[in-house]
Amino acid sequence: MASRDFLGRFGGEKGASSDKAGGGAGEPDEVVELSLGLSLGGCFGANSGRDAKKPRLVRSSSLAAMCSLPGTSDDIAAATPPPAPLMRTSSLPTETEEERWRRREMQSLKRLQAKRKRLERRTSMNSGKSGGSSSRDDAQEPLYPSAFQLRRSVVDQGNASSSMPEQGSGDGAEAKSTSSMEISSDNNNQNKSLPPPAPSTAGKLPNGIVKEQPPLRTLRSLTMRTTSTGDLRKSMMEDMPIVSSKVDGPNSKKIDGFLYKYRKGEEVRIVCVCHGNFLTPAEFVKHAGGGDVTNPLRHIVVNPSPSVFL
């Protein structure tokens, strides 16, 4: 059976069928379609009358509501409901052109009102500042002198004190010291009598704390300071000169010191540089290794040159 011809098998069936057809009265000849032309309802255009009685494949749909069931066309039309209309979706809410224009107009009006309020607030603040500053200046002008006038008066006093002639070593030093003390006391009294100036708006911080402005330092003030320190050192040298011991002997040594300032009727004191002790002239000579001498001032020498310790 396996060795039989496949086409012969179909041919035998064809002959048998032809015999049956010949034996039948009005049956048409059945032709087997051997081609591969496939379709849903069979081969298109072949045996349409006979194939109409056979059940055909039903075309399916992607929508569940539109699926058709096997049956006649009238039954399908009656059982199938009409498809629902599809709704068009969008990401933004539907609104008319009038609503959109109305919303834009409201936004523009709000912006204009906010801008107008800011301008009014700024103008009011500027006018208040200008009025307050002008009234403050008018009130303070007749009461307090300006900083330039104070600086000029101090400079004039310093020039007048420096232009005074020197009358002598001791008298000149005393005059300079007294004049400098008077100038400093006058300046202190002026500074104490003057109230602190009103702080400017530029030195204020956002939290209301007033920041103090540092005083201005000019070249003239610096030169005056250096000259005053030089005069002070010179006056100290004149009041307390440097002395040294002049002793001859095997155990003698040179000791430096300075003559401490003393008044009339007081005993002369010499400060020893090596130990810092206050000694009398006899003790100073004895400290240098001279022993007990009758006239100790002869063994003490005054050095006119400034010392390295000052």
Curated annotation (Swiss-Prot):
What GO biological process, any one, is recorded here? signal transduction
Q: Does Coiled coil show up as a keyword for this record? A: no
Q: Which InterPro entries match?
A: Ninja_fam, Ninja_motif, NLS_NINJA_AFP-like, TDBD
* Superkingdom: Eukaryota
**Compartmental location:** Nucleus
The biased composition feature labelled Basic and acidic residues covers 99-108
Gene Ontology CC terms: nucleus
Could you tell me which residues belong to the region Disordered?
A: 1-29, 68-140, 156-215
Q: What UniProt keywords are attached to this protein's entry?
A: Nucleus
Q: Which Pfam families match?
A: EAR (PF07897), NLS_NINJA_AFP (PF16136), TDBD (PF16135)
- Keyword Zinc-finger in the entry? The reply is no
Q: What name does this protein carry?
A: Ninja-family protein 3
Query: What is the organism of origin for this protein?
Result: Triticum aestivum
